[in-house]
Swiss-Prot record:
Organism: Citrobacter koseri (strain ATCC BAA-895 / CDC 4225-83 / SGSC4696)
InterPro entries the UniProt entry points to: RlmM_FDX, RlmM_THUMP-like, RNA_MeTrfase_FtsJ_dom, rRNA_MeTrfase_M, SAM-dependent_MTases_sf
Gene that specifies this protein: rlmM
Subunit structure: Monomer.
Name the record gives this protein: Ribosomal RNA large subunit methyltransferase M
PANTHER family attached to this UniProt entry: RIBOSOMAL RNA LARGE SUBUNIT METHYLTRANSFERASE M, RIBOSOMAL RNA METHYLTRANSFERASE FTSJ DOMAIN-CONTAINING PROTEIN
UniProt-annotated location(s): Cytoplasm
Superkingdom in the source lineage: Bacteria
């Protein structure tokens, strides 16, 4: 098995390919990416047979921006017989995976794959039973064993392989299933909700998204992102010249400040969160975010960077490198993650958490 499949947003295959090629090369793993426009996935083929396994085990999935999921696969299975698709799949996985903890039969996130997804749902039950009989899956689901992936790219045509539960997306097809809240003021609320699920471990929510925290939402109108913070019982300063939804103002938790998000300066020193979804050039937003972090105006931030039409991976990489350089220059240790979320379009979402000062004499967050 010398290939890695990476699922991505349709239309962003080139960015996904550029990223995996770059980040694999930094680990001295070389290969080439097979890219098909709007396919919703990329196949990265390694020159050395064991390198695909190295990628899915050692390249942190959390470091990838454009990939929704990542798993190692073998050769493409073609023309599966309609009367017995199971036997060839079991044959491909025998000797490759032993006692996997979960099965995911998936497709790319495209309109063309919607019919295929119906088949995948029906096919999962008999395939799971056959894989359990063959010892490829355990008799019960467990998050401690590898995930078995069967990825259909067309009827009767699939890749088979696996990923590791501590280095993959926990979500089917890499997509969290979120429901739009009827009382939210805009659909953008789902971006922040998804970001919280992707960037913050579930067992840390009560501590890091606690009742009574203070938060700032820059460019808040009409309040889609503020809504998520209010839902977590935070006190929110919503900064925007445009009006906020009355339903949010009625909670008593929101202070609306009619100011430009780029000019606003906080007057409290205990702000836990700053969030920002402003339509502006990514370099300008990155500079503002770096300013907030360097000055210690917030502990954690989630913000969006709008992408240009070309060289998107390069642009995002430069923006993240700028923020990292500013933090390094001021002796601030921080954790930076970026991801193009399912609910993002021509943008990526970034999370930065200040951890501690790298120089003596300063105490930041633990």
């Amino acid at each position: 098995m010398n290939k890695v499949v990476l699922l991505c947003r349709p239309g962003f295959e080139k960015e996904c390919a550029a990223e995996i090629t770059d980040k694999a090369a930094r680990r001295e793993i070389f290969g080439f990416a097979r890219v098909k426009d709007n396919a919703g996935y990329v196949v990265f083929e390694c020159y050395q047979p064991d390198d695909a396994e190295k990628i899915v085990k050692e390249l942190p999935f959390s470091s990838l921006i454009f990939a929704r999921q990542m798993f190692v696969v073998g050769e493409l299975l073609r023309d599966l017989p309609p009367d017995d698709r199971i036997t060839p799949i079991v044959g491909m996985l025998q000797g490759v995976v032993e006692k996997g903890g979960e099965l995911r039969v998936e497709v790319a996130d495209t309109n063309e794959s919607k019919e295929l997804m119906k088949f995948c749902r029906k096919f999962t039950v008999p395939l799971r039973a056959a894989l359990r009989d063959a010892g490829i899956l355990t008799n019960y689901e467990t998050p401690k064993r590898p995930v078995v992936h069967v990825f259909f790219i067309a009827p009767g045509c699939c890749y088979t392989g696996y990923s590791y539960p501590d280095n993959n997306s926990p979500f089917y097809m890499g997509i969290p299933r979120l429901k739009f809240p009827a009382d939210a003021p805009s659909r953008s609320t789902l971006k922040l909700e998804e970001a919280l699920h992707v960037f913050i471990p579930a067992d840390e929510w009560d501590e890091r998204l606690a009742n009574g925290m203070y938060a700032v939402d820059l460019g808040a109108c009409p309040g889609g992102w503020t809504y998520q913070l209010v839902k977590r019982n935070m006190w929110v300063y919503s900064v925007d010249n445009g009006p906020m939804a009355q339903s949010l103002m009625d909670t008593g938790q929101v202070t609306w400040l009619r100011e430009d998000g780029f000019r606003y300066r906080p007057n409290r020193n205990n702000i836990s969160w700053m969030v920002c979804d402003m339509v502006e050039k990514p370099a300008k937003v990155a500079a503002l975010m770096a300013q907030w972090l360097v000055n210690g105006w917030c502990r954690e931030t989630i913000f969006n960077l709008k992408l240009p039409m070309k060289k998107r991976y390069e642009e995002v990489s430069q923006n993240l490198a700028y923020i990292q350089a500013q933090l390094d220059e001021h002796g601030i240790n921080a954790q930076i993650q970026a991801r193009q979320l399912y609910h993002d379009r021509e943008e990526v979402t970034v999370h930065v958490r200040r951890l501690w000062a790298a120089v003596g004499g300063r105490r930041d967050e633990r």
